[in-house]
Amino acid sequence: MGAWEVVKKTAEMNVIRSTWAFKIKRYPDGLIKKFKARFCARGDMQIEGVDFFETYAPVVQWTTVRLMLILEVLLDLKSKQGDVTAAFLHSDLEEGENVYVEMPTGFRKEGHVLSLKKTLYGLRQSPRAFWKYLVKKMESVGLHQSEFDPCLFIGETVIAVAFVDDILFWSVDEKDIHEKALALRNQGVLLEEEEDAAGFLGVDIQKNEDGLTELKQEGLINRIVEALGLQDSAVKYTPAEGTPLVRDTDGEPFPQTFNYASVIGMLLYLAGHSRPDIAYAVNMAARYMFSPRSIHEKAVKRIGRYLKATRSRGIVLRPSENVLKIDAYPDADFAGMWGHEENTDPSSVKSRTGFVINVADCPVLWVSKLQNGCTAQSTMEAEIIALNHCCRELFPLMDMVTSLSTAVGLPQPMTTMRVCVHEDNAGALVLANTLPPQYTPRSKFYAIKTIWMREEFVKRKDILTVMKIDTVEQLGDIFTKGLPKATFEYLRNKLMGW
């Protein structure tokens, strides 16, 4: 592939070391797919402005993937997946980037180094260079980059998403996907023969006999249970206690029974892709990743025991008939740590934002996060902050749904968008629905920041409403606090479909 040429080493060269990287690639169920060995450059030895400049490279949002999977179920689309072999070796180094690498062990020639022509694995600029290469090739075969997601590509008959070198295709006719994949190969892209989309980035896409789709990560859950040593342990039926998880600085030290950071990393990936029901519990445990205590070990193991009891389940995509039906459920827990954490700890007075946005009654985006940007001074203020955060995600999502529905050619009965924001706080409802805003001395200082939100409500008033919801029906509640078993299972059923 002309990745390099051997040149004589000179004194002015910044020669970076090389290394071998060995990786096990797994199927979504955890079984080994193949062993990989890559000759890599030591990117940590590069010097910015000398042998690399820009490094940013986007990847597809999982919100986009879930939206496409909902459309697949609704419209009976065909889907295929492909993988670009030796992806980074497709793209050239940009002009002015002179990168020199040691020759690999066993092939060294005294006084000589490798002058790279292609973006070798390990270089800081490699992901960006390949992304730019892929965009160019996609455009050349009629797949145009979306303005709402830089890794979503829309054509006349095919839609594709890309996460580095992993690509998912959708079309009404499977033949169109094969033709588009062939066109990419003819452009020099080494795209492996596409297969049925049974999994993507470690998430199993299981299509049931009744036409429903379930996103699950049983293989990852098994690895978490094994890492925690819970194979023979009893199970739990909720992922978190009813009381918040505190810092416990003076408590018993962490007993080092497992790698806390590693397990938290796996749990975060799981919570962000197929298990929103554990998002609150995982976010709380992740706060103490760098200074865990014994109490945090027990909290993480509780999550593991809950996952053990529900390991075979994930998000069930059971879409309603209208993909343009969007529901947002923002919620907040005002100063939820107060009285549980030490009063001298600034985080004890922080509130928590939690929300989920459903498209066609299926969850596509969710958040459980501490309100670190500011400290709410009342329940209404905490709710407004949560509503504001939710709307920052909702409005672009509405535009993306409109774009995708146009691209796939929705039938006429499905072309009317209806968006509803479900709010359970009366004060937040009044502030959200009032324009021009009726400021009070207590609300002015933070309400000004949200005027854009109310202006958007006015612009979209024909399709968007903000309405009252009973607290017991508020889906956002599952993202803000630990709930009793009955309440948790009721909301989980509404959220996850089981």
Predicted regions and their residues:
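Conserved beta-strand elements of beta-rich interaction domains across eukaryotes
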Residues: 11, 25-27, 44-46, 85-87, ...
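Catalytic palm active-site di-aspartate
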Residues: 81-88, 115-123, 147-171, 196-206, ...
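Catalytic palm subdomain of template-directed nucleic-acid polymerases
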Residues: 25, 88-103, 121-125, 155-189, ...
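Polymerase palm active-site segment centered on the conserved acidic dipeptide of motif C
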Residues: 141-148, 168-221, 225-228, 304, ...
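Short, low-complexity Ser/Thr-rich regulatory SLiMs
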Residues: 10, 22-26, 154-156, 207, ...
